[in-house]
């Protein structure tokens, strides 16, 4: 199977076409993944409305745009000017510390939830313990404000029985933690108008910066977890830091080096990455097999709030 982490439409279409062509057994277009369904244009429109004064209040829940947005300081400055700002959060993070009101929410291990990661693949998350503190789940608060007498658990149960289980028992699904529905999963063909011959050829004198998330740390929501910080990157084997990955060819051309010091630790060159407004300095890792003309930098590092001092590692690539 061929995969890509790029959100570029052309790249995604090329990968789909390749998997269709090689008839990959691991590739199933009839059951797509449904995660990462955010809408960047809606978010950008909201920021423009904040700037123009069309929005006088904002509520955030389970997100930290004060850390993950590009030029997040500009967003936080806009939030500070609002008449009303409320953050539902488990931590005093960058966003919470800039809102007028903060509502403490329970940890995900204290909460109910359901998910559909892939088409027809439904999952339940159950609380493992009672909430340690006097907190209310965000969904329960919304139900209360809407005048409902149900709690979020009741709504999940009702929705599963009505729209998902189709005669199967709720108790069995609760015990298993999941339910698979294979309806409407007939194989489909890919139709693409993309002309590969019209795609631009990469000029290797220029460098493309690829921002990605690591397998262990992800987007940084759990960066205060030392076990995840200690999780070695499957490719570089590096822990407790992010870095700029560079191909051998580009490293040689730019005079970048890696070397081992007396205790066996890996050391090397540092580079400055700039977007014309902000700059960050990061160590370089020369990565065998990386495509010349590309450099990679992991997101999820460089957090400064809701973190103990020893966990403040890496740079914020957002």
Q: Whereabouts are the PLM-identified features?
A:
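Conserved strand-helix element at the start of the C-terminal RecA-like helicase core
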Residues: 2-3
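Gly/Ser/Thr-rich loops at beta-strand to alpha-helix junctions
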Residues: 7-11, 64-66
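Alpha-helical scaffold segments in soluble metabolic enzymes
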Residues: 13, 17, 45, 49, ...
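Anionic-ligand anchoring segments at beta-strand to alpha-helix junctions in alpha/beta enzyme folds, i.e.
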Residues: 15-42
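Active-site phosphate/pyrophosphate- and oxyanion-stabilizing loops and adjacent acidic/basic residues
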Residues: 16, 20, 73, 93, ...
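A cross-kingdom feature strongest in bacterial/archaeal respiratory oxidoreductases
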Residues: 32-36, 44-132, 160-318
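Non-catalytic, well-ordered alpha-helical segments in soluble enzyme domains
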Residues: 136-161
């Amino acid at each position: 199977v061929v995969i890509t982490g790029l959100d570029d439409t052309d790249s995604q279409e090329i990968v789909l076409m390749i998997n269709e062509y090689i008839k990959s057994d691991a590739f199933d277009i009839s059951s797509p993944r449904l995660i990462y369904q955010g809408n960047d244009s809606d978010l950008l429109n909201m920021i423009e409305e904040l700037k123009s004064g069309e929005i006088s209040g904002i509520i955030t829940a389970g997100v930290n745009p004060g850390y993950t947005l590009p030029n997040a300081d500009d967003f936080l400055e806009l939030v500070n000017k609002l008449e009303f700002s409320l953050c539902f959060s488990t931590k005093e993070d960058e966003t919470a510390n800039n809102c007028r009101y903060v509502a403490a929410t329970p940890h995900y291990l204290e909460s109910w939830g359901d998910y559909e990661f892939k088409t027809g693949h439904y999952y339940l998350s159950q609380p493992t313990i009672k909430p340690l503190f006097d907190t209310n789940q965000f969904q329960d608060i919304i139900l209360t404000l809407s005048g409902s007498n149900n709690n979020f658990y009741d709504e999940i149960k009702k929705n599963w029985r009505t729209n998902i289980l189709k005669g199967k028992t709720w108790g069995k699904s609760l015990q298993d933690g999941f339910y698979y529905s294979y309806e409407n999963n007939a194989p489909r063909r890919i139709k693409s108008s993309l002309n590969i011959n019209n795609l631009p050829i990469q000029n290797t004198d220029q460098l493309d910066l690829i921002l990605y998330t690591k397998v262990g740390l992800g987007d940084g929501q759990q960066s205060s977890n030392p076990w995840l910080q200690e999780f070695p990157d499957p490719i570089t084997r590096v822990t407790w830091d992010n870095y700029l990955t560079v191909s051998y060819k580009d490293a040689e051309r730019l005079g970048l080096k890696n070397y081992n010091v007396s205790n066996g630790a890996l050391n090397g060159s540092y580079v400055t990455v700039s977007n014309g407004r902000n700059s960050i300095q990061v160590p370089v890792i020369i990565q065998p097999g990386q495509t010349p003309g590309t450099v990679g930098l992991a997101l999820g590092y460089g957090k400064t709030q809701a973190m103990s001092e020893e966990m403040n590692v890496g740079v914020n690539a957002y």
